[in-house]
Every structure is written in C-alpha cells, then in structure tokens.
From Swiss-Prot:
Transmembrane segments: none annotated. Its EC number is 2.4.1.227. It comes from Shigella dysenteriae serotype 1 (strain Sd197). It catalyses: di-trans,octa-cis-undecaprenyl diphospho-N-acetyl-alpha-D-muramoyl-L-alanyl-D-glutamyl-meso-2,6-diaminopimeloyl-D-alanyl-D-alanine + UDP-N-acetyl-alpha-D-glucosamine = di-trans,octa-cis-undecaprenyl diphospho-[N-acetyl-alpha-D-glucosaminyl-(1->4)]-N-acetyl-alpha-D-muramoyl-L-alanyl-D-glutamyl-meso-2,6-diaminopimeloyl-D-alanyl-D-alanine + UDP + H(+). It is a peripheral membrane protein. Signal peptide: none annotated. The keyword Protein biosynthesis does not apply. The lineage of its organism: Bacteria, Pseudomonadati, Pseudomonadota, Gammaproteobacteria, Enterobacterales. This is UDP-N-acetylglucosamine--N-acetylmuramyl-(pentapeptide) pyrophosphoryl-undecaprenol N-acetylglucosamine transferase. The gene is murG.
C-alpha cells in the first residue's frame, strides 16, 4: 500500500512505552513513502531519541497535572490552551493527513489541535487501562485501538508494536526444547531498574543455588550494590548489568523472565515467547496489573503483586516450574501475542487518511 505524498504526525512522549511503539509505526509507514514528523516535548526522552531515527520533531510546552499543587492546577487551563495553540500552529504549517496519538501528555493538546483543524485523529492505547489523555481524546477520535482488551469497551485489540529483532526470534520450541542445566532467569526492572527486584533476587538466588543462573538488569547506578548483594548472598557467579542494550539477545538467552509489567515489556515477552513472573509496579490505577493479566489468564505467566512479594514466593514459584512447564508456558505466551501489531496500527492510520 503506497503512502506516497501522505503526511503523518505522531504524538507521543515521556516514556519508552509510548515512544518506541510510535517509532515502529513511523518506520513502517516511511517505508511505504509516507512523510512523518513528531510532536513532543523538549525535556523528555523523545527529544533525543526521535531525531536519531531520522524523524524531525516539533516541541510544545506541556506537562502532567497529576500530583501537582493547587497553583499548578489553577494555571492548568491556560497552559493547556497555550500548548493547543502551539500544536495548532505546527499542524497548520505541516498539514498532516492524519495524526497518531500514542500517549503521553503531548497527545492531549495535539489531538485537540488536529480535531479543531479537521484532521483525523487515530489513537492507540498501550496499557490495559486507559490513560487520562486517551480517555479524553477517545471522544473526538476517528479510530481508537488498544493493545489489551478492557482499556476501552468497543475498541479493536491490535496489540503493541514491538521491535523487529524481538519478532524475529526463533519460536519457543526451536529455542528451548533441547536446553539442559540451570534454568536461565532474566531479571528486568525497566530502564531505571526496580529496587524491590534488586533487593529480593540475590536472596532468591541463595535459596535456589545451582538450579538457576541469573542475568540481572539492575538499572542506572545500581550495578555495584546489586553485585555486592549477590556476593554477600554467596552467589557472585550471576551476571549483573546496569542496562541491556540488546533485549532480543537477552530474551533469546532466557528460559524465564522476572520483571515489572509495563505495556511494552509484556508485549515483547509475549512476542518473544517467554514465561514470566510479573511483579507489577504499585500504581494508583493498577495499570501494570491489568497489562499482565491476559498472560496470566493464558497460562503463560504468574503475577505476584508487590505487597505479597517475598523471597520465598519468588523462589517457590521458580522452583515449581520444570523445563517442560516453562516450554508450555512459552508456547502459550507466543500464541497470545499479536506479532503484526505494527502493521495493524499502520493500516488504520492509512484508512483514516484516505477517509
């Protein structure tokens, strides 16, 4: 499907969970001849990341309202109005055929600006429970899609766009069937790490002994303290890295993952075909719990919520999974994934632009 001459503006910012799926869709459409620009904020990760992908970015000034003081809330309508004016001026100059909102504060003023100019607004909700911005924008959107069922009652479930190197991994049967020796446990707390996993997993390693080998992503500035915790637990042999650049290689190595359940992490683990022990971040709306629930229901994962997390709970869960069980869970994870999510989102963007 050629997009020659068509123009898309992607609105996404703040976290990798919003930005990376947006980049996947942008690259897919650029390969079809689309022109793509990005709407973001200058002080968040998209400011550095998006230009590295060969995409020009425009900035508006906007930030979140949750947890702000009364003065900030009083000033909020004016700030939103100014951000809307900035976004509207950018869109009047660029003249996109369609805008794609992938979440983050920038999507709010951007979506309203597009709607006020008669530009179709397509939304994608990455999480199992809808964010505030997308809840508002859904009322004016041309099309609403969701990664997991339940965020919106009638929205199409299309999955989350994930990186092509993860999608290219061999299927679980090819990867895991012949494996022997200690079970390979990948511990991931997101790019910032997760203090609770950094504190718990060295003690889990001590309980499980030689039955596991662990690769632990500690997050920024925590590598030394986590290595020390493993050494003090009598388990210095395990690998601790601050950040994992090649997640596809880490998934290929692993037999099971112990991790938080951010939307992109859950979708990548399903696409890779891996069993998981999820420890959702304790957010007010339990967003990460709802992200992980479909894989637990599919028999591909177990959720331990943070108040119930203990060394024994993790150790007993991992010890209870034989290699045969892990392979069955891995196959269920892969079966629950939506590997063509990028294409599905891109197709809806194309349809909205032609309507």
């Amino acid at each position: 499907m050629s997009g020659q001459g068509k123009r898309l503006m992607v609105m996404a910012g703040g976290t990798g969970g919003h930005v990376f799926p947006g980049l996947a869709v942008a690259h897919h459409l650029m390969a079809q001849g689309w022109q793509v620009r990005w709407l973001g904020t200058a002080d968040r990760m998209e400011a550095d990341l998006v230009p590295k992908h060969g995409i020009e970015i425009d900035f508006i000034r906007i930030s979140g309202l949750r947890g702000k003081g009364i003065k900030a809330l009083i000033a909020a309508p004016l700030r939103i109005f100014n951000a809307w004016r900035q976004a509207r001026a950018i869109m009047k100059a660029y003249k996109p055929d369609v805008v794609l909102g992938m979440g983050g504060y920038v999507s709010g003023p951007g979506g309203l600006a597009a709607w006020s100019l008669g530009i179709p607004v397509v939304l994608h909700e990455q999480n199992g429970i809808a964010g505030l911005t997308n809840k508002w924008l859904a009322k004016i959107a041309t099309k609403v899609m969701q990664a997991f069922p339940g965020a919106f009652p009638n929205a199409e479930v299309v999955g989350n766009p994930v990186r092509t190197d993860v999608l290219a991994l061999p299927l679980p049967q090819q990867r895991l069937a012949g494996r022997e020796g200690p079970v390979r446990v990948l511990v991931v707390g997101g790019s910032q790490g997760a203090r609770i996993l950094n504190q718990t997993m060295p003690q889990v390693a001590a309980k499980l002994g030689d039955s596991v080998t662990i690769w632990h992503q500690s997050g920024k500035s925590s590598q030394q303290s986590v290595e020390q915790a493993y050494a003090e637990a009598g388990q210095p042999q395990h690998k601790v890295t601050e950040f994992i650049d090649d997640m596809a290689a880490a998934y290929a190595w692993a037999d099971v993952v112990v991790c938080r359940s951010g939307a992109l992490t859950v979708s990548e683990i399903a696409a890779a075909g891996l069993p998981a022990l999820f420890v959702p971040f304790q957010h007010k709306d339990r967003q990460q719990y709802w992200n992980a629930l479909p894989l637990e229901k599919a028999g591909a994962a177990k959720i331990i919520e943070q108040p119930q997390l203990s060394v024994d709970a993790v150790a007993n869960t991992l010890a209870g999974w034989s290699r045969e069980t892990l392979l069955t869970m891995a196959e269920r994870a892969r079966a629950a994934s939506i590997p063509d999510a990028t294409e599905r989102v891109a197709n809806e963007v194309s349809r909205a632009a032609r309507a």
